[in-house]
Amino acid sequence: MDPSEMPAVHHCPSDSATGGETRAPQGMELIPRRAVRRSPTCARCRNHGVTAHLKGHKRLCLFQACECHKCVLILERRRVMAAQVALRRQQEAQLKRHLTQGLMRGAAPPRAPSRVKKGVTQPGVHSGKENIAPQPQIPHHVVPLALTSPGKENSRGPLLLSRPPEALPLPWTPMPPGPWAPGHWLPPGLSMPTPVVCRLLCQEPAIPLHPFPGFDPGTTLRLPTHGPLPTCTGSHPILTAPLSGESQGPSTLPRTCSTLILQPCGTPDPLLLQPQAPGPSRLTWTSASSEWQLQREAAEALVGLKDSSQAPRLTPGPANPAWISLLHPCGPPAAAGGRGFQPVGPSLRPSPAPSVALHIGRLGSISLLS
């Protein structure tokens, strides 16, 4: 056999004789074998022991319709490989799409700082300039009233004006409960232009006060509980009387606060009565120089009231017409005319410690509260 014909015989698929391969030189056999191994061959033909190149062999394959066990396995493997290739291509397409969307989203953040500079900066974050002070954190319950943009006033920094909620004080003042008070709370006192107000607070037996010369009505007199009475210099005397039943004996009134109020007839509104805490006896007298006669007549009326405190009726003198009303803290008020007691309410019930109001003609009225 001619050696030049051996390559053609070797590449023929129908030729199965290998006797000429042993006769061929060893150097000439390596090159064709390497070329055959590199070229793809048909799998169906290879299962049946036939080596055929794939180029142009798909339509000419002799085992294309074979359904043997080996050919079925080859078909299944081809289907799996085709599905894997399709899945890999789909994943690559999705990955490319996600990458493009991520690039578009990543391009948006560089524009965010330009928008932040136009608005208000966040609290505690610097905008890049050293002369801007950090803004303090605002609580949720505080509402800012004014905000200055950092772009206009960078030297001063943002200014925050806040108004925290404040509790408004109630106009009611707590007072200790007393026998005359209806409750524990009383409304605040109203300011009234009363010309003469005299309050006598007693805890110990009452001190008899007698007129003495040299008293100035424009001054204030405070009397201690124990010791001699102070002396004052003035041109008008002062007349006072003890509040007890006896002239010099101990007081029969209970140990509560007593208030003596001198009120003119022209005052339409009554004074607000507030309880006072028990303390040392003191007398505060404030009046004008033109009303010293009113004080004198009031003291004389108290002297007459002391003598007739147990009597059912009190008749004033003809020269000084007056009316007296006894007011009980828990009972209805009663009033009397110029001739005597004429109760307006259903009944007149005096108590051991009543509140007495004395009206002195045109001069005014006196209220004694105990």
UniProtKB/Swiss-Prot annotation:
Locations listed in the record: Nucleus
Chief location bin: nucleus
Keywords, ordered alphabetically: Differentiation, DNA-binding, Metal-binding, Nucleus, Sexual differentiation, Transcription, Transcription regulation, Zinc
Record-linked Gene3D superfamilies: DM DNA-binding domain (4.10.1040.10)
SUPFAM superfamilies, A to Z: Cysteine-rich DNA binding domain, (DM domain) (SSF82927)
A Pfam family that the UniProt record links to this protein: DM
Any GO molecular function: sequence-specific DNA binding
Gene Ontology BP annotations: cell differentiation; regulation of DNA-templated transcription; sex differentiation
DNA-binding region residue numbers: 42-89
Region (Disordered): 1-27, 103-136
GO cellular component: nucleus
UniProt cross-references to InterPro entries, sorted A to Z: DM_DNA-bd, DM_DNA-bd_sf, DMRT, DMRT-C1/C2_C
Homology family: Belongs to the DMRT family.
The protein's role, per its UniProt record: May be involved in sexual development.
Name of this chain's protein: Doublesex- and mab-3-related transcription factor C2
Native source species: Bos taurus (Bovine)
Gene expressing this chain: DMRTC2
